[in-house]
A protein has these predicted regions:
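A short linear hydrophobic-aromatic micro-motif
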Residues: 80-81, 148, 292, 428-433
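Conserved PLP-enzyme active-site core in the AAT-like
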Residues: 125-342, 377, 457
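Short Gly/Ser/Thr- and Asp/Glu-enriched loop/turn motifs at secondary-structure junctions
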Residues: 10-11, 29, 85-89, 298-301, ...
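Long amphipathic alpha-helical segments
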Residues: 1-74
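Structural motif of enzymes handling amino- and sulfur-group chemistry
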Residues: 311, 319-320, 327-378, 386-391, ...
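Long amphipathic N-terminal alpha/beta scaffold segment
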Residues: 52-101, 107-108
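Conserved C-terminal alpha-helix-loop-beta "cap" of PLP-dependent enzymes
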Residues: 362, 366-449, 453-454
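Glycine-rich phosphate-binding segment of PLP-dependent enzymes
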Residues: 38, 43, 87-88, 98-124
Length: 465
């Protein structure tokens, strides 16, 4: 194939500038941005011609160069972070933003982020206040801790705690708890950055209380326990409880710090889920500091929450890294509103989207799946309701499988892969999972009002019979 003729067919930049100006692109996007897009898209076309052997596609792309330039310019002015429909069945989907904030709080949150607020202003005293004041009392009431604060994520919470309380000192931790928390970030790395000296002990599957006792010396600053929330070791295993560590710590005058991970504030085993230790249990057991995530099983915004003894929290608040890790006004507001729901367990289960999705009765999910299937009965595909399993996600309850129902769609005249891609590229992207060459819409994670949206997108892509 003679590719030179295709390269020669690419319009000159000056010609494209004139065409874009005539098409009104300069008026809409400005000359500088339009010219940048011209250069970017012509270079992309050259690269494609150099690699491709598909003459038809080369001609199509060359003929659509002007619309392609306009699309590239428009994309610069359009939001890239957009809402999607989560039909994967993974409740805490890390790639899709993890926990949802309740829509009932949207108006208040919009008022906070779009206007001034009393973020660090004491309205009663008429003086500077503290941003933790909006949720600290709630955290203390719910968990039983003496004091509380929050930073931007749980890795920061652990690092800040260790840096403030243990820098330069040794911190024994079980080898079986040296987890990787995602994105190749690991507990040993976080500890190293904090300035604490990690002392790993025990083995992957077994750690005894005597291992901790043997590791304690005059340089020991604290004892660390990390809840392995994103994996399980089963079989010939043994670990040391928080209560046992606290007893040992008290004997040697050492605080116990626990990274409990997912931040469970309600015993979810009452609702048919796998038991996960709660923050309250750790505080009652005597842990000096407990760190956990805000956007996992707690069901709030991304945050690293630190609760525990007043003297330790006071010291952490004064650490220089606290400002580097501090939360913004949106997080403070969303955390307060989420925690208020926990003042009543019934309200929390009903109003916090994560908890509501996790505790949905299977029959309710089935009914919603049947509703969507009925709406799709005339589309050009084979559609049926199937039983499936959802998962918690977000590194929480890794062994938990939740009974659910999905709408399985096998398109006619289109591959399932092409259909899944079309759903992803829709105006309101629909993210599903592909199983046995069918697109599955797991209704557990489909939110109110989204069923109709899915039906419209599917019909638009597949057409009707």
């Amino acid at each position: 194939m003679d590719k030179n003729r295709f390269f020669r067919a690419i319009p000159k930049v000056d010609t494209l500038i004139e065409q874009c100006d005539s098409a009104g692109l300069f008026d809409r996007y400005g000359r500088e941005i339009t010219v940048d897009c011209i250069r970017e898209r012509t270079e992309a076309l050259r690269e494609f011609i150099g690699k491709s052997e598909d003459e038809t596609e080369i001609i199509r792309r060359t003929e659509s160069l002007l619309p392609d330039i306009a699309s590239a310019a428009e994309k610069l002015f359009s939001p890239n972070l957009n809402p999607v429909v989560n039909a994967t069945g993974t409740v805490l989907h890390t790639n899709l933003g993890r926990a949802l904030i309740s829509r009932k709080h949207a108006e208040h949150l919009m008022a906070i982020v779009s206007g001034y607020s009393n973020l660090e202003y004491d309205l009663e005293a008429g003086a500077r206040g503290e941003r933790y004041s909006h949720f600290e009392k709630l955290l203390c009431r719910i968990t039983g801790a003496e004091a509380a604060m929050a930073v931007n994520n749980n890795a920061a919470a652990v690092m800040l705690t260790l840096s403030a309380l243990c820098r330069g000192g040794e911190v024994p931790v079980s080898r079986g708890e040296l987890v990787e928390i995602g994105g190749k970030f690991r507990v040993p790395d976080v500890m190293a950055q904090s300035g604490a000296i990690m002392v790993d002990l025990g083995t992957t599957n077994k750690t005894h209380l005597s291992d901790y006792e043997d590791a304690i010396n005059e340089n020991t600053a604290a004892l660390l326990k990390v809840h392995t929330s994103n994996f399980r070791v089963v079989g010939f295993t043994e670990s040391v409880s928080v209560a046992e560590l606290v007893e040992l710590g008290n004997k040697h005058g050492l605080p116990v710090i626990e990274d409990i991970g997912s931040g469970v504030l309600i015993d979810l085993s009452k609702y048919g889920l796998t038991y996960e230790p709660t923050v309250q249990e750790s505080i009652r057991a005597g842990a000096a500091i407990v760190c956990f995530s805000g956007d996992k099983l707690l069901g709030g915004p991304q945050a690293g929450i630190i609760v525990g003894r007043r003297d330790y929290i006071k010291k952490i608040k004064k650490h220089p890294l606290t400002r580097a890790f501090r939360i913004d006004k949106f997080t403070a507001a969303a955390l307060e509103l989420t925690l208020q729901e926990y003042l009543s367990e019934e309200n929390a289960i009903r109003n916090i989207p994560v908890l509501r999705m996790l505790t949905q009765p299977p029959m309710e999910i089935r009914e919603r799946a049947e509703k969507l299937a009925a709406m799709l009965k005339n589309v050009n595909a084979r559609v049926e309701v199937v039983d499936c399993e959802s998962q918690v996600g977000g590194g929480s309850m890794p062994l938990e499988r939740l009974r659910s129902s999905a709408v399985a769609i096998k398109p006619n005249g289109m591959t399932t892969a092409a259909f899944e891609e079309a759903l992803r590229r829709a105006e309101r992207p629909v993210i599903c999972r592909v199983q046995e060459d069918r697109a599955l819409m797991d209704m557990r994670t489909v939110q109110p009002g989204e069923t109709e949206l899915i039906a419209a997108e599917v019909a638009g892509i597949l057409g009707v019979k």
